A protein has these predicted regions:
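Mg2+-dependent prenyl diphosphate-binding active-site environment of isoprenoid biosynthetic enzymes
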Residues: 1-178, 214-215, 240
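Solvent-exposed, charged/polar functional surfaces in cytosolic regulatory/catalytic domains
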Residues: 43, 219-226, 241
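Alpha-solenoid HEAT/Armadillo repeat architecture
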Residues: 49, 171, 185, 225-228, ...
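Short, structured helix-loop boundary elements
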Residues: 59, 119-122, 193, 206, ...
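A short structural micro-motif
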Residues: 65-68, 128, 186-190, 202, ...
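Mobile late-domain/C-terminal helix-loop "cap" segments
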Residues: 177-224
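Short, amphipathic C-terminal "tail helix"
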Residues: 229-247
């Protein structure tokens, strides 16, 4: 499911690299990439069919998550032509990324009696981890290199995609943000990125974004404390891997 969405995402974003590997649509063409993505998506139900319990429930959730990811991606594309508030950004992130993490955590409660009573906590933990992951992507793409990220880091600017940084800048000072957007319009892509990076730092947007990450991290830790003691270490390790990632 994850790889299926990435293949289609690369087509829509016209990205040339994914983890420093040429994307499928770039190596071949869009038609072959669509087929590859569809094929990967079809593998999910085949594997789910081999699960011995709650198979139908998991299959239904699998398809519900695909719909939710599509909703999130539709928001992402819509926001290319208009501003998006922080609340709208978080809704988009919860759907396009958080829903996938949530599904992975939820399945554990559906295949094991040990975690069934913690289904709602696991779902909430997964969704918040997904939002953290998406916010980090936005910050890293602004602050690090394409080589480090393994993909282009200027495509969001080129396509006028909305990130946590742009949404926070909008909510922080709508007039200043509109003025900056107008000012950078005729500059090169790299110059735009440098000017945006300077603004995000000088106006405190980066600090606010990191503050949001800390709040989400605390929320995840609080949820982990509600889960069985036997998985506390594993869940905290996973949280640390996600919040401390550099690419």
């Amino acid at each position: 499911l994850h790889n299926f969405t990435l293949v289609h995402d690369d087509i829509m974003d016209e990205d040339d690299l994914r983890h420093n590997v040429v994307t499928i649509h770039k190596k071949w063409d869009n038609a072959h990439a669509v087929l590859a993505g569809d094929g990967l998506g079809a593998l999910g139900p085949i594997f789910i069919g081999k699960i011995k319990r709650n198979t139908l429930d998991i299959l239904i959730r699998y398809n519900e998550v695909i719909l939710e990811i599509c909703e999130g991606q539709a928001y992402d594309m819509e926001f290319e032509s208009r501003d998006a508030s922080v609340d709208e950004y978080l809704l988009m992130s919860a759907k396009k990324t958080g829903s996938l993490f949530e599904f992975c955590f939820e399945v554990s409660s559906l295949i094991s009696d040990d975690y069934l009573e913690f289904k709602s906590e696991l779902k909430e933990l997964g969704r918040n981890l997904g939002i953290i992951f998406q916010i980090q992507d936005d910050i890293l793409e602004m602050s690090t290199s394409s080589e480090n990220m393994g993909k282009g880091t200027s495509s969001d600017i080129e396509r006028k995609k909305k990130t946590i940084l742009s949404s926070m800048a909008l909510d922080h000072d709508k007039e200043k943000w509109a003025s900056l957007q107008s000012k950078i319009e005729d500059f090169s892509l790299e110059e735009k990125k440098a000017m945006l990076k300077e603004y995000y730092n000088s106006s405190g947007i980066i600090d606010r974004s990191n503050g949001l990450l800390l709040n989400l991290e605390k929320k995840c830790k609080d949820i982990i404390n509600l889960l069985p003691d036997t998985i506390h270490n594993d869940m905290n390790d996973l949280l640390n891997i996600i919040v401390k990632r550099k690419n």
